[in-house]
Amino acid sequence: MKYALSNEGRIEATPKANGICQCCESYLIAKCGTQKIWHWAHKGKRNCDHWWENETQWHRDWKDYFPKEWQEVVHLSDDGEKHIADVKTPNGLVVEFQHSAISLKEKLSRETFYKDMIWVVDGRRLERDFQRFNESFRTSDWRHWGPFVRKNRIPSRSLPKSWQSSKKLVFFDWGFVKSEYWIKDWHSHLICLLPETDELGWLQLIAIEREQFTEIVSNSSNLDSNSLFW
């Protein structure tokens, strides 16, 4: 994790630093090597939050789009269950950044636990996922819905099935890639998968600029597809 508690408040890992886990209040070890990003870890292989995944630079870069106070916030349910949200805004919206594979059971558990949440998925993890997604636009056209938003529909085979059952908005980050089927500068957009298919069972997508995405997230709660059309 990025932050630990100390006498100075929340601090990032530095060599020989001491910290306390904000979730379980146990001592943390500052991991400051050369192979991985500097982070805090529990002793041994223990981790108090089983939803937590090892962070990559991709995680850190996304978190840093938002204020430090919003990053790694402990979310407590009515029954006392606790988990660390990647980002939680003052309006109560949780953003989870997912790089590694995730089971359907865990995905649904997180959506039920956080309630008001969205996903940002690292689409670059498997190269074939982007190739399949990119190819689907060979014969499709984006429709304009305002200055920053475009809408489209593609067959279900175009995106990983593991995310098509989500009840929340899923934003795919394909990185700053180039595509012969996308118009100029669209490689900087996020592609949002809506929870609802159209009347023919096709997936519905929204393309939104990164800056506009962070602005909407920062000012919204209970974000849904209607929030993206203004």
Predicted regions and their residues:
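Short, conserved loop/helix-junction motifs that constitute active-site signature segments
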Residues: 111-114
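Active-site metal-binding core of divalent-cation-utilizing nuclease and nuclease-like domains
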Residues: 11-13, 25-31, 61-109, 128-137, ...
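Short hydrophobic alpha-helical runs that function as membrane-insertion/retention elements
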Residues: 116-121
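Nuclease-adjacent, charged terminal/linker segments that flank catalytic cores
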Residues: 1-71, 77, 214, 219-230
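Non-catalytic C-terminal interaction segments of nucleic acid-processing enzymes
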Residues: 2-9, 13-16, 124-230
